[in-house]
Amino acid sequence: FGSEIDLDIVVHLGAGAYICGEETALLNSLEGRRGEPRLKPPYFPAVKGLYMKPTLVNNVETISSVPWIIENGGEEYNKLGVEGSTGTRIFSLSGHVNNPGNYEIEMGTSFGEFVDTLGGGIRNNKKVKAYIPGGASAPWFRGDQLDIKMTIDDVANNNSMLGSGAVVMMDEDTNLVSAAKSIVSFFAHESCGQCTPCREGTTWLEMILDRIASGRGRTSD
């Protein structure tokens, strides 16, 4: 790249396990081990990471911001967004929208503005029944909460989280029980099995939601 810095870049393709989004599970996978989280402490990556060597773990979104910051400076980057949530972030928009995709936007934009301007609105001009603000594990918002700002604080103050930045819009015709079952089934399948509440709990949740979705729900459910 025209500099005096010399380094090797190796691209290692993972198998796509959800748990390997956790940094220590990712390191286990790179070492050829079972993809499951390590105990922290003592296995903080910066202390005992890949092959027990100090390791810096960053995701692609973080790295993608580095060139702009190097060129323009951190102070300029912090002028983007709002206080407490500065800069930009990459959000993945999917569901019942006209223009699904990955978008880099300034923090502080409302979910409604995001969907209307970049997402092209909801398909067939339907209303939003509910939406997921930050990935499958984030608590959902109602369709009348589109004015919530895409900031850490505003989302947290409304009892959810930005999480992975995966925004999923569900229109007025969506069966929310079936949608919840689909997500729970995903977690049941992707559980690494290390911890009992996740390993057993997600399977039970899947069975309960399956009963409700098929009309066999119980009062206790």
Positions of predicted regions on the chain:
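Ferredoxin-type iron-sulfur electron-transfer modules in oxidoreductases and energy-metabolism complexes
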Residues: 1-7, 149-221
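Short amphipathic, charge-patterned alpha-helical segments
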Residues: 107-125
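Terminal amphipathic helices with adjacent charged low-complexity linkers/tails
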Residues: 9, 122-157, 210-213
